[in-house]
């Protein structure tokens, strides 16, 4: 069974709203894995692998999970992606994750890059084997056959 949780916002992306070490939305996502300390991976492709969201993800999940970050842009911001970063050369490591959390940005750019690198196929395989799929905005759109998007302007 495939488990998908899509969000319009919130969670670790908005710590000023909930002011808790782990937000209720993130706790819900983690609980869907059925593991006490799951392997969780942030994918920021839609936002160009900006370092800020990746760093917030790692900080938010450090005490409750085993966080990692996947980057397709090959950025090497010291301390941002962490020692367990997943790059274009080792994308198969996504299959080791209990949860994959995809951030927002451009749905069209995200899908194009995933297809180019074969990440879309790997994520389908991961989902079929029980990896929980989570996403916010474009990161939520990517799990479905169709969606509305602002990727092409208004």
Residue positions per predicted region:
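Extended, subdomain-level signal for the structured scaffold at the beginning of enzyme domains
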Residues: 1-108
């Amino acid at each position: 069974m495939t488990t998908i949780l899509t969000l319009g916002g919130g969670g670790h992306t908005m710590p000023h709203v909930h002011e808790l070490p782990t937000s209720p939305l993130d706790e819900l996502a983690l609980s869907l894995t059925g593991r006490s300390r799951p392997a969780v991976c942030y994918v920021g492709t839609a936002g160009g692998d900006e370092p800020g969201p990746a760093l917030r993800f790692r900080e938010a999940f450090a005490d409750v999970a085993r966080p990692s970050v996947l980057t397709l842009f090959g950025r090497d911001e010291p301390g941002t992606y962490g020692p367990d970063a997943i790059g274009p050369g080792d994308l198969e490591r996504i299959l080791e994750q209990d949860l994959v959390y995809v951030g927002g940005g451009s749905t069209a750019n995200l899908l194009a890059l995933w297809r180019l690198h074969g990440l879309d196929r790997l994520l389908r395989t991961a989902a079929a084997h029980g990896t929980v799929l989570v996403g916010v905005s474009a990161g939520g759109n990517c799990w479905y056959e169709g969606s509305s998007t602002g990727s092409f302007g208004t």
